[in-house]
Amino acid sequence: MFSFVDLRLLLLLAATALLTHGQEEGQEEDIPPVTCVQNGLRYYDRDVWKPEACRICVCDNGNVLCDDVICDETKNCPGAQVPPGECCPVCPDGEASPTDQETTGVEGPKGDTGPRGPRGPAGPPGRDGIPGQPGLPGPPGPPGPPGPPGLGGNFAPQMSYGYDEKSTGGISVPGPMGPSGPRGLPGPPGAPGPQGFQGPPGEPGEPGASGPMGPRGPPGPPGKNGDDGEAGKPGRPGERGPPGPQGARGLPGTAGLPGMKGHRGFSGLDGAKGDAGPAGPKGEPGSPGENGAPGQMGPRGLPGERGRPGAPGPAGARGNDGATGAAGPPGPTGPAGPPGFPGAVGAKGEAGPQGARGSEGPQGVRGEPGPPGPAGAAGPAGNPGADGQPGAKGANGAPGIAGAPGFPGARGPSGPQGPSGPPGPKGNSGEPGAPGNKGDTGAKGEPGPTGIQGPPGPAGEEGKRGARGEPGPTGLPGPPGERGGPGSRGFPGADGVAGPKGPAGERGSPGPAGPKGSPGEAGRPGEAGLPGAKGLTGSPGSPGPDGKTGPPGPAGQDGRPGPPGPPGARGQAGVMGFPGPKGAAGEPGKAGERGVPGPPGAVGPAGKDGEAGAQGPPGPAGPAGERGEQGPAGSPGFQGLPGPAGPPGEAGKPGEQGVPGDLGAPGPSGARGERGFPGERGVQGPPGPAGPRGANGAPGNDGAKGDAGAPGAPGSQGAPGLQGMPGERGAAGLPGPKGDRGDAGPKGADGSPGKDGVRGLTGPIGPPGPAGAPGDKGEAGPSGPAGPTGARGAPGDRGEPGPPGPAGFAGPPGADGQPGAKGEPGDAGAKGDAGPPGPAGPTGPPGPIGNVGAPGPKGARGSAGPPGATGFPGAAGRVGPPGPSGNAGPPGPPGPAGKEGGKGARGETGPAGRPGEVGPPGPPGPAGEKGSPGADGPAGAPGTPGPQGIAGQRGVVGLPGQRGERGFPGLPGPSGEPGKQGPSGTSGERGPPGPMGPPGLAGPPGESGREGSPGAEGSPGRDGSPGPKGDRGETGPAGPPGAPGAPGAPGPVGPAGKNGDRGETGPAGPAGPIGPVGARGPAGPQGPRGDKGETGEQGDRGIKGHRGFSGLQGPPGPPGSPGEQGPSGASGPAGPRGPPGSAGSPGKDGLNGLPGPIGPPGPRGRTGDAGPVGPPGPPGPPGPPGPPSGGFDFSFLPQPPQEKAHDGGRYYRADDANVVRDRDLEVDTTLKSLSQQIENIRSPEGSRKNPARTCRDLKMCHSDWKSGEYWIDPNQGCNLDAIKVFCNMETGETCVYPTQPQVAQKNWYISKNPKEKRHVWYGESMTDGFQFEYGGQGSDPADVAIQLTFLRLMSTEASQNITYHCKNSVAYMDQQTGNLKKALLLQGSNEIEIRAEGNSRFTYSVTYDGCTSHTGAWGKTVIEYKTTKTSRLPIIDVAPLDVGAPDQEFGMDIGPVCFL
């Protein structure tokens, strides 16, 4: 078989041949030298230098690329030191290198870094040279002899294939690079070069007189660079330069061919801890643990049936006052009081509102002339005036400017000849004449004398490259060269030992809130509470808690394996693929909402003053000014004589508080007035009785974050979540490593010579090249160490919105954000509950006087004022009070209805009334504004560790994990045999009750609890701020009796009667009907005033008389006694919350709450199964510089600790054929095991290791199997919580047995009062009784409870039988009475009671009834209950009624509960 290894070997050979060929080709071309400049120093291409100790640079094609030196960890060298000028620590000489030892001890902890060593002494300075004359540059020397050809360092071991096994013992390790010495002084100048060649002749100058040779001039500026010469022949390849440092990361090259299979590598360092192996067989049960932490609150159970009535509660608190009764009939009109004394002058009234604008007044008197206005603008030009008279002749003017020269005159005759001038200067050279014909060759002259040697001519242009000279003789050995630059980077060393764990980082800031998590699984049900005292038998009570688990039964034997089943359902979906390419851009989003209006802009600068406008017309008269303040009061004048009565004035301001009158009879109910303004604050009322419990308030602000709780116990393995949706497309990756150097291109055309530019800065790394063709997939390499975290990439393009993710767990509360911009007003919210009163604010400054308010309602009657000073005698009074009643006149016709009176003027605020009784609780006020968050409370005590979470379902295979460190390969051991089933452990003690769980969602309303005892008095509340005016309410109930109605119109005056003797007070006569109001009669003459007679007997009620005139006001009387208690005032604002009342008696068990909110994420689960090997990781960081090229030396690889002497020849795994064979066996075994496991999932066997979900599943997969005991795991996931059940293979029923199926036959209960028969629950109320638990021996009750919950969900019907053994105890039918009054009660698992008669859904049937009478012999009754409401079964308790006497005994057989 052509293996993968062979293929790789072939490909590697091909790659090597190609590369070697490429190197040979590259050597034939001449690559012009390229230089780099850094810090004023010039370096050649491929030069390497270290500008700083920990930085290394290389000249690469004119670019300086620098990188930080990465030091190897010196793990096995505690005293490592950094030599001066070096970057990396090295072992001092005495330390043992790892290669010297064959075994190493356990690695010690990492030592502290040693102190930095002292700097070495500087080298001695060089000798000063003698300054020489500057020599001329010599010609290029002959090329040196060719260096020995070097092989590429990386290929040496592959080309040599072998390895010198003998040399392994002494693999030499190159020492660290020494520090560079100080720069020496300049050396002596070189000797002057030889005479240069004769330069070409210059152009001929003009012939001058030949002067003497001048001194040598200064050198001219350098000429322009000449054109490039033609290419010379290629020189011999130079010696191989020192290797350059690691280049910058190049663009990714195309994938190379796979190399040959390398030698077997050393054993890697210890790998990261492997994934947890498969769960081992169940160990022996441990000793009972301490009580566990309280469990989380369980899920809300189904609502129970109506519970039995509880015992009567204590008397309730006093109820609220009843509603106000209907108004009584109007009382009789009281007598009018005498006129009072004139009151004192009232205080100045409040300023009235501003009056309406008056009509326009007459035009005012003309005003004073205004000040002169500013000058107006220039007016337009006027019309031209008429011509003036001609003026007199003027004086002569000044002479004018000289005129322009005239035209030239005619030419004059020639003048006489002048004398001859001196000779002119020498003319310029004439243009060169045409060249003459070539003359004959002259005779050879005598050699002239040797001239003075001229100065060397200027350097000629560079000649063409001469032909290659013969190699010269070998020169003397040169002086030792300066220290070479660092070599090229070697292969990366093997991974170092993992360093010690770093210190814990600081706590990070809270992350953003995660997405809402998916709902957690239902928590376990809480433990059963202790039995309460037995109350009177009531109507059915709420369901009781689950009973304790009985001791587990012995485990049954595993059944035999069945035949293979039919193919199973389709497997789970595979791992999600990598994200697809980015989709097309989505449609543009909706237009955003309108933004918040911006803040007002700054006020602009004032404009320039405009020009004054024309004077406007006078304006209309202004409105009347405000009324001036009242002047000071004048001194009081003497009382004048009373004047005649004026017309009735407007209603005066309310007088001072009068004496309280007697309480009038209640008048008819008045119309409901509008709601007045809130009165002044009343005196603190006594605290009212505790009101009913309010609705849950809105959740308060989050408190300050408490101290972190103690870490909870680790939860069991949670299920890995479903794989998330593909994330947004990541940013572009880092550039790939530098590709191989390309072949040299053809020579370009000659460019025009440019000037040398200043060297630019190093350019940025180029963009990534195009992706190479995919190489063949290599074998999965060992995992490399995780690279450092990269910088955060730029945000990618926004992807299309994904589907909503699953809800995340609730995140911690974020920090308070900055206040947002003010939003637009929202819709009016629903009326909130009353907030707690805020703290009283500081007293504000007095506000400005407000507008006059609307008149308030009439104030309450004030208390009596102090008696006023006696006034002057008043004016003559009006007519006195009516005389005694005359005889009744005939009833008059009914008068017309009077108009509704106008609203009275606002009274002054009366003093505070007496504290009223506490009114009924007012309606909730509107929600107060949200108070500012309170100061952080003190940190809470650490919470108790949370309970272990339930194991989650197994998640989908995760994405490939990060590449782990390379581990030592261990061969897998053979699978062990499963251990024997351990004996069952003793059941642990019951744990303490758990803490209260988080509040569940509001359940359906429970039945009313018993009345709580009244709470302690609350402290008085502060006033709430007045609420806004409410909407007009609906008509309220009839109010209390109103004030006495207005008196009717006066009747006619009867004749004065005689004064009768004073009779004794007669009994009150019945109230007569109110007669119709008579018409007003004329006033009769006033009779003389008689003596006051004694009160006569009460006559029949007369017709209502006319209204008398008001009498004079009497002097103020003494204060009256307090009136009767008035009706309750309107309910005051809610006071602050009082202190908590004393605890009420416990209410009935409430219904189970709804599931609480999802808890915080559990502790990190166990490491999941190993994922598939990931793709190769990114290239690791560059390794340290390699040794100089030549051969390849493996000595720099750190030798791992080895047990045997290291065998240098076995570097490569493929060299050992046994390993491959073992590996194949291992793969085969794994595949077989996997296929077996998959088969087990598709067709479960019902064994402990491979349980089915239900017996129905087993029946479908294995229809020919017999009924018997099998293992099932309804909640799937880990099979450690599987339970053993009986499977009825005829029907597919799953039957779960009770842990204690029999109740002994004996006397279980003796009643204190045997005649008073009532149902007594066996498990709850009888001594040594227990509630029935299920699941068989050895099973954990909590596991069984969960499994039963799942089993109920997957079933449509449940049934159970119970056999009641009796002696003198009726179980169902009472033979004596023929009825079912004495029948048993059963309690279902949801605490519902199942009876013998009543609602057919909650009644059981009897298949055999042998307990109908008291015969003194044992009998039995078989009870059966079948239901489609699977939550009612299994039965957990039984209550017989006919027990309690000493001769009454019973026992029970509890049958299995079967689900179908």
UniProtKB/Swiss-Prot annotation:
Cleaved propeptide residues: 23-157, 1215-1460
Record PTM Allysine, positions in chain: K166, K1204
Residues found modified as 4-hydroxyproline: 186, 189, 192, 201, 204, 207, 222, 237, 243, 252, 258, 285, 288, 294, 303, 309, 330, 339, 342, 369, 372, 384, 390, 399, 405, 408, 423, 432, 435, 447, 456, 471, 477, 486, 492, 510, 519, 525, 531, 540, 543, 552, 561, 567, 579, 588, 597, 600, 618, 636, 642, 648, 654, 660, 666, 678, 687, 699, 711, 714, 720, 726, 735, 753, 768, 774, 795, 801, 804, 813, 819, 837, 846, 855, 867, 873, 882, 891, 894, 915, 924, 933, 942, 960, 969, 972, 978, 993, 999, 1005, 1014, 1020, 1041, 1044, 1047, 1116, 1119, 1122, 1140, 1155, 1161, 1176, 1179, 1182, 1185, 1188
UniProt protein name: Collagen alpha-1(I) chain
Stretches for region Nonhelical region (C-terminal): 1189-1214
Subunit structure: Trimers of one alpha 2(I) and two alpha 1(I) chains. Interacts with MRC2. Interacts with TRAM2. Interacts with MFAP4 in a Ca (2+)-dependent manner.
Upper classification of the organism: Eukaryota, Metazoa, Chordata, Craniata, Vertebrata
Low complexity bias: start-end ranges: 194-213, 275-291, 314-327, 375-414, 534-560, 569-588, 630-657, 692-720, 780-794, 807-834, 863-879, 908-917, 927-951, 1004-1019, 1074-1088, 1122-1155
Pfam families, alphabetized: COLFI, Collagen, VWC
Disease: Defects in COL1A1 are a cause of osteogenesis imperfecta (OI).
Entry PTM: Contains mostly 4-hydroxyproline. Proline residues at the third position of the tripeptide repeating unit (G-X-Y) are hydroxylated in some or all of the chains. Contains 3-hydroxyproline at a few sites. This modification occurs on the first proline residue in the sequence motif Gly-Pro-Hyp, where Hyp is 4-hydroxyproline.
Modified residues (5-hydroxylysine): K261, K426, K501, K747, K858, K1029, K1092, K1104
Motif residue range(s): Cell attachment site: 741-743, 1089-1091
Species the sequence originates in: Canis lupus familiaris
Residues involved in Ca(2+) binding: D1273, N1275, Q1276, C1278, D1281
